[in-house]
């Protein structure tokens, strides 16, 4: 069983969001909260645009008040998975568009109340790299978690349109994920526990944010029996049931980056034919320049994937075969010749099987790939809007390739 965490910062009482009755706030208390919040924002290393956007979100949030089921108008479904369904909804009293995650749980009232209480720590998670939180409440057998709506969706959805995500774009993704993980760890002593493409959200302003991190131990425990996955982003040490730490999140990030770069979940690794279909030319394997193996391999678990002009007809890897592969076989890697050596080395450092030898957050933040990516002007918003055919609200910089 996962250990319970306790919030390390005093809760920000911006607004009452537990559906057990609103708590009155005075004008003086609101001003004190804003001063407290201002101090917390000053502690973060934000540029002017990030600070203004975060302040704008928190100003909107302060006007929301108590969240109730009757106040929401469902617009569309955004996605499903991880034990819940996420819908795009309008909060009628405020007029705000939110992402509302509904999790159906057969639980006792005491457990439900504990989950709602534990979720309140999300009010303290104010970062440009963390999806904004409006509140959580319980209604008709469902926990509702109300979040900032990200109009670009998740990176697994973006990947379906893009087919592969360019290295310079993934550089910006890597920076955001590392900074988000560092924020959770340093400011709140929280591990994410579920880093994967579907939990990295993007929007047409070019923001990249983490969502669905393990803030509620009780919710994790309550959902454990209902989770059935076809892919795993868990580290070898976590799959083996041994002690794990933020190093496990780093493995998950590395695996996600390989998937986004090559266009599909990377276990088992693609063979030469599949890589040639994906990249449009023969791809070499490793530093020795040898071609990738042409021997047929099982395809990744889940639905068949498109290869070239047809569907992949290889037998799917069973989930137990996948987990065994992660634990016992060599880790995935990026193919040579199509990515920079810096990017390849960065991913390799994330995917070292021994967590004691795996790179930590500090080392990765100082890696040459990250330093190069920080210095590059990449129009992430423009690339995303072209890929998803979204209207772009921001000013482009350099066109991403």
UniProtKB/Swiss-Prot annotation:
Reaction equation(s) it catalyzes: L-seryl-[protein] + ATP = O-phospho-L-seryl-[protein] + ADP + H(+); L-threonyl-[protein] + ATP = O-phospho-L-threonyl-[protein] + ADP + H(+); L-tyrosyl-[protein] + ATP = O-phospho-L-tyrosyl-[protein] + ADP + H(+)
Needed cofactors: Mg(2+)
Taxonomic source organism: Mus musculus (Mouse)
Free-text tissue specificity from the UniProt record: Expressed in adult intestine, kidney, liver, lung, pancreas, spleen, thymus, and at high levels in the neonatal brain. Lower expression is found in adult brain and heart.
Keywords: Acetylation, ATP-binding, Cytoplasm, Kinase, Magnesium, Membrane, Metal-binding, Nucleotide-binding, Phosphoprotein, Serine/threonine-protein kinase, Transferase, Tyrosine-protein kinase
Source organism phylogeny: Eukaryota, Metazoa, Chordata, Craniata, Vertebrata
Site residues, Cleavage: 10-11
Residue numbers carrying Phosphoserine: 23, 222, 226, 293, 295, 306
Signal peptide positions on this chain: none
Segments of this protein annotated with the region Disordered: 282-310
Protein name, per record: Dual specificity mitogen-activated protein kinase kinase 2
Posttranslational modification: Phosphorylation on Ser/Thr by MAP kinase kinase kinases (RAF or MEKK1) positively regulates the kinase activity. Phosphorylated by MAP2K1/MEK1. Low levels of autophosphorylation have been observed.
Cellular component GO terms held in the UniProt record: cell-cell junction; cytoplasm; cytoplasmic side of plasma membrane; cytosol; early endosome; endoplasmic reticulum; focal adhesion; Golgi apparatus
């Amino acid at each position: 069983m996962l250990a319970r965490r306790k919030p390390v910062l005093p809760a920000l009482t911006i607004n009452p969001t537990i559906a057990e009755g609103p708590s009155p706030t005075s004008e003086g208390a609101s001003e004190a909260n804003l001063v407290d919040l201002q101090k917390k924002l000053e502690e973060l290393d934000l540029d002017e645009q990030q600070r203004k956007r975060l302040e704008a979100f928190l100003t909107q949030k302060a006007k929301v008040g108590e969240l109730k089921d009757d106040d929401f108008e469902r617009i569309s479904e955004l996605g499903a998975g991880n034990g819940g369904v996420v819908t795009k909804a309008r909060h009628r009293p405020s007029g705000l568009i939110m992402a509302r995650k509904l999790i159906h749980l057969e639980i006792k009232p005491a457990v439900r109340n504990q989950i709602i209480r534990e979720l309140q720590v999300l009010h303290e998670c104010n970062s440009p790299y963390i999806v904004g939180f409006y509140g959580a409440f319980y209604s008709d057998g469902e926990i509702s978690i109300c979040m900032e709506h990200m109009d670009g969706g998740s990176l697994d959805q973006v990947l379906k349109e893009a087919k592969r995500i360019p290295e310079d774009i993934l550089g910006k993704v890597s920076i955001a994920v590392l900074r988000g993980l560092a924020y959770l760890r340093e400011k709140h002593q929280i591990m994410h526990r579920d880093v994967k493409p579907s939990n990295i959200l993007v929007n047409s302003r070019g923001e990249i944010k983490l969502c669905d991190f393990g803030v509620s131990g009780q919710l994790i425990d309550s959902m454990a029996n209902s989770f059935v996955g076809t892919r795993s982003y868990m580290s070898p040490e976590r799959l083996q049931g041994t002690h794990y730490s933020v190093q496990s999140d780093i493995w998950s990030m590395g695996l996600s980056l390989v998937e986004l770069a090559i266009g599909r979940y990377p276990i088992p690794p693609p063979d030469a034919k599949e890589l040639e279909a994906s990249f449009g030319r023969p791809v070499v394997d490793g530093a020795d320049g040898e071609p990738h193996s042409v021997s047929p391999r099982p395809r990744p678990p889940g639905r068949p994937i498109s290869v070239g002009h047809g569907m992949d007809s290889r037998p799917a890897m069973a989930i137990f075969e996948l987990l065994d592969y992660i634990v016992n076989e060599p880790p995935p890697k990026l193919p040579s010749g199509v990515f920079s050596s810096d990017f390849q080395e960065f991913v390799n450092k994330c995917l070292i099987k021994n967590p004691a030898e795996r790179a930590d957050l500090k080392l990765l933040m100082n890696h040459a790939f990250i330093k190069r990516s920080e210095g590059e002007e990449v129009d992430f918003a423009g690339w995303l809007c072209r890929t998803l055919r979204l209207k772009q609200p921001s000013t482009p910089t350099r066109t991403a390739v």
